[in-house]
C-alpha cells in the first residue's frame, strides 16, 4: 500500500511539473512574439532613418518615388528637405527638422534595443528554468516507471 501511495505522489508531482513546463513554454512563446515585434519596429525605424537621410541630401524640387502600397509608387516632388511631419502618438503629429526627427528615431531605437535585451534576458532565464523542470520531470518519470515495475512484480509474484 505504501508503494501505491508513493506512486500516486510521484504522479501528482509529475503532473504539477508538466503544468509548470506548459506555463513556461507559453511565457517563452509570448516573449518571442514580443521580441519579433520589437525587431520589426527597429527595422522600421532603420528604414525611416535611411529615408530621412536621403531626403536631407535632396536639392529642392527633386522628383522622388513615394510608396503607396502593394509595391506601387507615385512620383512626387519634395519641396521642403529640411522639415518633416512626425507622429508622436495618439494620432498627433508635429513638424520637426530632419535632424530632430533623426534624433528622436535614435532615442526610440535605443529604447527598443533596451526592451529587446531585457526580453532576451527574461527568455534566457525562463529557458534555464524550463530545462530544470524538464530534467526533474524526466527523473520523476523514471521513478514512476520503477515504482510501477516493482508494484507489478510484487503483485504478480
UniProtKB/Swiss-Prot annotation:
Its main location: cytoplasm. Keywords: Chaperone, Cytoplasm. It comes from the Archaea. GO terms for cellular component: cytoplasm; prefoldin complex. CDD domains: Prefoldin_alpha_GimC (cd23160). It is found in: Cytoplasm. Pfam families: Prefoldin. One of its GO terms (biological process) is protein folding. GO terms for molecular function: unfolded protein binding. Belongs to the prefoldin subunit alpha family. Molecular chaperone capable of stabilizing a range of proteins. Seems to fulfill an ATP-independent, HSP70-like function in archaeal de novo protein folding. NCBIfam families: prefoldin subunit alpha (TIGR00293). Heterohexamer of two alpha and four beta subunits. This is Prefoldin subunit alpha. It comes from Methanopyrus kandleri (strain AV19 / DSM 6324 / JCM 9639 / NBRC 100938). The lineage of its organism: Archaea, Methanobacteriati, Methanobacteriota, Methanomada group, Methanopyri. The gene is pfdA.
